[in-house]
Amino acid sequence: MKLLLAGGGTGGHLFPAVALAQRLLEQDSEAQVQFVGTARGIEARVLPEQGWPLELIDIRGFVNQGLLGKLRMIPCLIRSVWQGLCILRKFQPDVVLGVGGYASAPMLVAARLKRIPTVIHEQNAWPGLTNRLLGPWARCVCLSFSEAERAFHRAATIVTGNPLRKGMEGCPPMDGDAPELLVFGGSRGARAINDAMLEALPRLEPWKDRLRIVHQTGGDDLQRIREGYARAGWPQESVVPFIDDMAAAYARAHLVVCRAGATTLAELAACGRAAILIPYPHAAADHQTVNARAMAKKGAGLVLAQQNLTPETLASLITDLLENRPRLISMSAAAKSLGITGAADRILRVCRNVCGQD
C-alpha cells in the first residue's frame, strides 16, 4: 500500500501519523509512505531527522482570522490545493489519510479531485471545523473518542483510538520510588504552564528533597525557566526544551501536569498516569476542554482552567495528589482503563479496506 499522511503542525497531529507509518512498514516492508506538511510545523524538523520523506505545501490557518483575512487566504488555499495535486501526481498514493493540521485540508481536497480514497483521523472529542466539513467527503472517519461521533452524522465513522509512539503501550505500572512530576505543555511548550510552575516552586519547598521534576519547556522559554529553577534552589538538569523519549518520561512519572490535547490524553491512558489537565483555551472549538472533561468524568484527571491557573492553585493540587497515594493510584488505574490499544492496526485496516487491499 502507498499511504500519504497529510497534516501535522503540532506533535498531537504528527506523532500518531508517525506511529501509523512505523506500523505499516512493520506489517509490510514493501509499503511506501509519504508525509505532507508545512515549513512552520514541527514535522519540518522531526521528520527529516527520523528519515521520513516529507513534501511541504504553503498553507496557514484561517479559522481565527477576520473576514478580510479569510478573503486573502483564498488564493493561498487554491495554491496549496494545486501543490497537493502535484504531489499526488508524483507519489500516486492508494489512499490519503488526513491527520489534522493545516496541510490536511488541501491534500484531502486534492485527493477528492483526483478521486483517490480519503480517510480522516480525528483525535479530539470535539472535531475542528475542517474535519467536520470534509468528513462527509471521506470514505471513513476514524475517531479517538466516541463522543466525536455526534459531529459526523453524515459520515461513516469508526472508533479506533489514537496511535501511540513506540513504548507507550508497554509502560510499566507506577512504582513506589520517590515521586517524580512530569510537566509539559505540548511539543512547543506552554508559557502559562511554564510560568505557573516556576512560581509554584517556592510553595513546593517541603518536597524539594523528595520530588524530582522533569519539565519540558519548549525552546523559547528554556533559558528563563532554567534560571528560575536555579534561583529557587531546584535542579535544572531535568528542565529541557523537548523530550525525545516520552515513553520513558511517562514510565518514571507519578503525576503529570500538561495540556489536554488528544494525543497527550491517549498517552496518559496507555501509560496509566494521573494528570492535572490545563486545556489550551484558544484551541479550535475549545476542544481541549472537551477532551479534558471526558477524562475527568472517568476519574482519570483533574481539570484546571487556564483562567484559574495560579501558582497557589497548582502547588496545592500537586501537593494534595502526591500526599494522597491511594487517590493517585485510583486516578492512574482510571486512566489505564481508558486506554485503547491497537489503534494503528485498526486505522490501517480501514485504509486497506477503502482502497480495496483488505
From Swiss-Prot:
One Gene Ontology biological process: peptidoglycan biosynthetic process
Membrane-topology descriptor: Peripheral membrane protein
Cellular compartments per GO CC: plasma membrane
Subcellular location(s) per record: Cell inner membrane
Entries under Gene3D superfamilies matching the protein: Glycogen Phosphorylase B
SUPFAM superfamilies in alphabetical order: UDP-Glycosyltransferase/glycogen phosphorylase
EC number assigned by the record: 2.4.1.227
Reactions catalysed according to its record: di-trans,octa-cis-undecaprenyl diphospho-N-acetyl-alpha-D-muramoyl-L-alanyl-D-glutamyl-meso-2,6-diaminopimeloyl-D-alanyl-D-alanine + UDP-N-acetyl-alpha-D-glucosamine = di-trans,octa-cis-undecaprenyl diphospho-[N-acetyl-alpha-D-glucosaminyl-(1->4)]-N-acetyl-alpha-D-muramoyl-L-alanyl-D-glutamyl-meso-2,6-diaminopimeloyl-D-alanyl-D-alanine + UDP + H(+)
A Gene Ontology molecular function term of the record: undecaprenyldiphospho-muramoylpentapeptide beta-N-acetylglucosaminyltransferase activity
Pathway terms, separated by semicolons: Cell wall biogenesis; peptidoglycan biosynthesis
InterPro entries given in the database record: GlcNAc_MurG, Glyco_trans_28_C, GlycoTrans_28_N
Ligand binding (UDP-N-acetyl-alpha-D-glucosamine): 10-12, 124, 165, 187, 243, 288
EC class name: transferase
Record keywords, A-Z: Cell cycle, Cell division, Cell inner membrane, Cell membrane, Cell shape, Cell wall biogenesis/degradation, Glycosyltransferase, Membrane, Peptidoglycan synthesis, Transferase
Function: Cell wall formation. Catalyzes the transfer of a GlcNAc subunit on undecaprenyl-pyrophosphoryl-MurNAc-pentapeptide (lipid intermediate I) to form undecaprenyl-pyrophosphoryl-MurNAc-(pentapeptide)GlcNAc (lipid intermediate II).
Family note: Belongs to the glycosyltransferase 28 family. MurG subfamily.
PANTHER family membership: GLYCOSYLTRANSFERASE, UDP-N-ACETYLGLUCOSAMINE--N-ACETYLMURAMYL-(PENTAPEPTIDE) PYROPHOSPHORYL-UNDECAPRENOL N-ACETYLGLUCOSAMINE TRANSFERASE 1
Protein name: UDP-N-acetylglucosamine--N-acetylmuramyl-(pentapeptide) pyrophosphoryl-undecaprenol N-acetylglucosamine transferase
Organism placement in taxonomy: Bacteria, Pseudomonadati, Thermodesulfobacteriota, Desulfuromonadia, Desulfuromonadales
